Amino acid sequence: MMKRILRPFQILYCIYALCIFACLTIISLFAMIFILPMGYRYLTIGIYKIGRYFSKTLYLFIGMRHQEIYEGVHHFNQAHVFVGNHNSYMDIPPIVQLKHQPIKPLGKFESSKIPLFGLFYRHIVIMVDRSNPEKRAQSLQNLKEALKNKISIFIFPEGTFSMTDEKPLKDFYNGAFKLAIEMQVPIQPVLMVDSVDRMHFSGIFTLSPGICRVVYLPTVYVDNYSLDDLEILKQQVHQMMDDGLRRYRKYPAS
């Protein structure tokens, strides 16, 4: 009964949040005009900072609070392959708030088609079109280029939303872990603990204010791993993240 009474207010809140999102997108596009002539690294850092201000301002106006929890030591002056769980569109804003280092996320090509936002999105992420082998290979080269320039990358190893409340994670793809081994870059697992509560995967009109916790799990160093150990590394990180999510959220026993 109470949910029915509050539902109209939630819809109004969601419309308000979408308006704030649209305004910030327009402002960010204008800000980007001034940094486009910069070289690769400084352009990436500039776009990261714009994205960070975008995210922090969005949170301020829609009543959300970013909180980071560290279960291990993280070296901010070193490039990492960040990997995180993915079951909400609200997993995206925390990525650029992961302080204090520039990050290039791997994102779906389809999202670049969103009116207005798509223009901003193309410069923030490294896009992947999984339906096109050539473009997929180019995305891999772009990820490697970022790491060579000491820019961290962020990959959702599940590949898409985990659209279930029954278990924390889907199976992982190999890409992030293969890349970390090949480039000898440490893996930083992070947990988006509350994103699904802020916006459920069932629809955008489930948006609600509140806390958004991001948990840094201990960094996984890959110095002693070869490509022959790819499956071992992938399962190790999957187990770490599964255990971590079960500590912070309630799931049925596995």
Model-based region annotation:
Residues F61-I69, R136-A137, V196-M199:
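Short gly/ser/thr-rich secondary-structure transition/capping motifs
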Residues E68, I126-D129, V222:
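Short acidic-hydrophobic, aromatic-tinged amphipathic segments that line or gate anion-handling sites
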Residues E71-F76, T206-L207:
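A short beta-turn/loop motif at secondary-structure boundaries
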Residues E68, F82, P105, V214-Y216:
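Generic preference for hydrophobic
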Residues T25, L29-K49, F61, H75-P133:
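Catalytic core of membrane glycerolipid acyltransferases/transacylases, capturing the structured
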Residues R4-P8, Q138-S254:
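Non-catalytic C-terminal accessory region of glycerolipid acyltransferases
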Residues M1-R65:
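N-terminal membrane-anchoring alpha-helices
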